[in-house]
């Protein structure tokens, strides 16, 4: 991409994190104020942009540039995305996101949450 969307509309909150949450993982709410990894193309609430000492900084809105994805159906435009583990996938029951860039060689995409 020849333009930068870094910083666009970012909104980050700090929540407790389950042990399997890593930086870059799409996450879902798993309890009161706690996030964990998604399973089976579940809708995610945000992306973990920082993880430390049992807490995660979760980006809930804005541009995220290097989201790993798997499967087909991830393309530029509005796409419903769910997640399985640390990867996004096109999913009917997913969250509508604006996909602004797709790198098929690296299997990553840039999205606006």
What positions do the PLM features span?
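Surface-exposed, low-hydrophobicity beta-strand/loop segments enriched in small/polar/acidic residues
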Residues: 1-113
């Amino acid at each position: 991409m020849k333009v930068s969307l870094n910083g666009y509309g970012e909104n980050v909150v700090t929540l407790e994190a389950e042990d399997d949450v890593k930086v870059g993982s799409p996450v879902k709410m798993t309890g009161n104020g706690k996030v964990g990894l998604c399973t089976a193309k579940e809708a995610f609430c945000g992306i973990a942009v920082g993880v430390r000492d049992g807490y995660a900084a979760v980006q809930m809105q804005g541009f995220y540039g290097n989201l790993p994805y798997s499967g087909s159906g991830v393309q530029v435009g509005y796409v419903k995305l769910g997640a399985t583990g640390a990867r996004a996938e096109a999913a009917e029951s997913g969250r509508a996101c604006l996909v602004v860039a797709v790198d098929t060689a690296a299997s990553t995409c840039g999205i606006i949450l």
